[in-house]
């Protein structure tokens, strides 16, 4: 297996221009494909997950052109439902942001489509979404294990009243919301359980509005969407920088700044993960907000005990930043870490112990007490881009760290390690 050893870093200082947001990129691609008119997306993320979405749209007859660096995409919208010519199988890797929305959107109209992916994708639950789509008339079969991909979709979704469990993943609701306007009837979506990762729903609603569709949001408990609508291209659309990706650089600034500034997001960003900066501030770092940047300057860091449900992806970065804070850090209400690219609660606890931390792994929380001295370790990354990026922060000590399978960052940030090196001064 490939590995990368990071030598100790004495100081970080500089500016990072963030790649486009994964959450925004894949939503925007799908809406542009469904819309009438041509859409030019700029600052699109070039990563595995986005390539899976693009390949799927291409197989569904959507035409687009990409710039050489794959960050500008001009898409010709279909002005409605996506149709496959005959039976089709789409391979979506481990891209939840492609699997969930496509599973819903391809239940409109008459299709016969199989959605499949990597072995890990077949372990990521999709039953709550399928249940909701079936209530709206969709014909869906599980081809292997009940409640998990691969799925066979044969159209039939017509709207009406559907209930969806919101306690596992907000992507199920996102998928229903983006599909509902194209259904023949109005759709009312009622949420069962507590809705996790609410800010991701705001991204969805924001993008739908950009493409000309309004949703009635009744306090995140019920959503009412009129049927027989059409998405309309906004013409040009700039994809915000990825706020989850920003978290590693901002944390590095908090631990070993200098000052690290990330551009492409700012105080008015639609991504909930910008709230990560508030956590660093609470720990003792200094944060400066601009319209198009967030900057973090080093501070004496103290442990925090916080509910992290609103920023599940960025919260992982706090788990490794906790190694540099005084006291015991507790991250709560993060059950949905368990259904991401890997079981992130287990993975994080296991790897933090390797570098010497004392860790308590709960059902939906993690408690971390840093050691007096970090130990050198080879960090397993579980084919999870965020594990690789989180543990790069260990090098901000006087101990090197080895990251196994470093290329797994390609899911969202192919040149992450080069960017980190660019702002680092070796010890």
UniProtKB/Swiss-Prot annotation:
This is 3-phosphoshikimate 1-carboxyvinyltransferase. 3-phosphoshikimate binds at residues 22-23, 27, 169-171, 197, 313, 336, 340. It catalyses: 3-phosphoshikimate + phosphoenolpyruvate = 5-O-(1-carboxyvinyl)-3-phosphoshikimate + phosphate. Pathway: Metabolic intermediate biosynthesis; chorismate biosynthesis; chorismate from D-erythrose 4-phosphate and phosphoenolpyruvate: step 6/7. NCBIfam families: aroA. Gene3D superfamilies: Enolpyruvate transferase domain (3.65.10.10). GO terms for cellular component: cytoplasm. It comes from Citrobacter koseri (strain ATCC BAA-895 / CDC 4225-83 / SGSC4696). Belongs to the EPSP synthase family. PANTHER family: AROM/DEHYDROQUINATE SYNTHASE, PENTAFUNCTIONAL AROM POLYPEPTIDE. Monomer.
